[in-house]
Amino acid sequence: REYPAISGSVPPHLTRGTGGPTVPAISDIVFDAGFSSKAEAESYGVRPGDTLVPDSSAILTANGKNVISKAWDNRYGVLMVSELAKSLSGQALNNELYVGANVQEEVGLRGAHTSTTKFDPEIFLAVDCSPAADVFGDQGAIGEGTLLRFYDPGHIMLPNMKDFLLTTAEEAGIKFQYYCAKGGTDAGAAHL
């Protein structure tokens, strides 16, 4: 039988400054088919030594609970922001709203520098795709809610913004996780 899976490892930009290798060793690569336990994987017939064949399409996991796709970062954020823009279309707002997709975040926040210089926003929300690192015993578990990134090396969220987001999530019944990141987002350029 065939089951979709995704390969993963700790991204190189999250190991920066740790003294660890910048390219993962083969033994550091994990394959995740979305099963919640070894027993569940075995119940589907998965065994050590099974053959893996690369596939880059977007698909559901065998248990139907998750989506597998390559390069989520930052496609997921763009999808969320475009859906938000559609839902606000035609509504009267008490402010000016600019929605964009910045480029070259991983190599110096270049797009964010350009857009924040041009528009000089009073509030900037960076919608990004943070890693679900629960496989590696770290923070960010799939299915446990959105990650509220309150700190990363390039940005510390203002306390009032953090309180606003927490209150909004709690009042709306939105599941969230606290997230302290090793890598940064476009918010690092926006707050300067």
Regions found by a protein language model. Give the residues of each.
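N-terminal hydrophobic/helix-forming segments and targeting peptides
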Residues: 1-192
